[in-house]
A protein has these predicted regions:
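A short alpha-helical cap/connector motif
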Residues: 1-117, 123-202
């Protein structure tokens, strides 16, 4: 990550903090999202990070020191190739090109994938972002995750504000898919435009 990119991320994070302090917060920026991922990882004990929506790989790279293993999924072929080059020096990161709906089962079937934090940020948002069969596959991805709940420590769904817009599931549908994910041990929070689902310790 370049010095200019890092400085811009810090500046954006300061703006987020200022907006929070003035009750005018709307959309968290990259570094703010990373700090939340880091907090969830530490609270849940997650050692493996699965991300859908690699984009340019900046969040992935920031997460590299926080997890033993990272698998990130990008549907757009060019973005995935660029991310592989950007992240090539991070030996604990694997970049996969494909649809999260197809990739998730293959990843979670691996015996060495345990104590996982899944970060669902793989939706079409215009510009160069990739698009699958549906604009926002989060609810479909969560249905897949239910089959592997014993491997998960937590998951996060990003951009909660977008749900209910054309092409996106309703907010209520997303919450319904999340609220009993870990049965009686589910802790669900909506914070900084993200839905966070944690497995509570027994």
């Amino acid at each position: 990550m370049s010095k200019d990119t890092g400085l811009r991320a810090i500046t954006d994070h300061v703006q987020d903090l200022w907006q929070l302090a003035n009750f005018s917060f709307h959309t968290p920026r990259s570094l703010t999202k990373f700090r939340q991922i880091k907090s969830v990882a530490r609270n849940s004990g997650a050692q493996c990070f699965i991300e859908s929506g690699t984009y340019k790989g900046h969040t992935t790279k920031r997460c590299a020191p926080e997890f033993q293993r990272i698998v990130t999924i990008e549907i757009d072929e060019k973005l995935a190739q660029n991310a592989k080059q950007f992240l090539c020096n991070n030996l604990n990161i694997e970049v996969l090109q494909g649809d999260v709906i197809d990739c998730l089962p293959n990843i979670l079937d691996r015996d060495d994938i345990q104590n996982v934090l899944v970060y669902l940020d793989g939706h079409f948002s215009g510009g160069i972002t990739g698009k699958g069969e549906i604009d926002e596959p989060a609810c479909d991805a969560i249905n897949i995750l239910t089959k592997y709940a014993d491997k998960l420590s937590a998951f996060i769904v990003d951009d909660f504000r977008e749900f209910g817009k054309p092409g996106f599931p309703k907010k209520s549908h997303l919450i319904d898919a999340c609220e009993d994910f870990f049965g009686d041990h589910t802790k669900l929070t909506v914070h900084l435009d993200q839905v966070i689902v944690l497995r509570m310790n027994v």
